[in-house]
C-alpha cells in the first residue's frame, strides 16, 4: 500500500514538473513570436522607405529612429 502511494506521489510530481516546463516554454515562445513581428514591421518600413524615397539601404539602417 505504501508503494502505491509513493508511485502516485512521484507521478503527480512528474506531471507537475512537466506542466511547469510547458508553461515556461510557451511564454518564451510567445516572446520570440512578438519580437519576430516587430522585426517584420521594421523590414517592411525599410522596404517602403527605400522605394518611396530612393534612399540607399545603409542609410536607412543607420539613421532609423533618429530625429
Curated annotation (Swiss-Prot):
Stimulates smooth muscle contraction in isolated rat stomach strip. Keywords: Amidation, Amphibian defense peptide, Cleavage on pair of basic residues, Pyrrolidone carboxylic acid, Secreted, Signal. The keyword Secreted applies. Residues 31-49 form a propeptide. InterPro entries: Bombesin. This is Bombesin. The modification Methionine amide is found at residue 64. One of its GO terms (cellular component) is extracellular region. Its main location: secreted. Residues 1-30 form the signal peptide. It is found in: Secreted. Belongs to the bombesin/neuromedin-B/ranatensin family. PROSITE patterns: BOMBESIN. GO terms for biological process: defense response; neuropeptide signaling pathway. The modification Pyrrolidone carboxylic acid is found at residue 50. Expressed by the skin glands.
Amino acid at each position: 500500500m505504501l508503494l502505491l502511494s509513493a508511485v502516485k506521489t512521484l507521478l503527480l510530481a512528474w506531471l507537475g514538473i512537466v506542466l511547469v516546463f510547458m508553461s515556461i516554454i510557451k511564454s518564451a515562445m510567445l516572446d520570440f513570436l512578438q519580437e519576430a513581428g516587430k522585426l517584420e514591421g521594421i523590414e517592411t518600413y525599410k522596404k517602403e522607405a527605400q522605394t518611396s524615397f530612393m534612399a540607399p539601404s545603409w542609410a536607412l539602417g543607420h539613421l532609423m529612429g533618429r530625429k
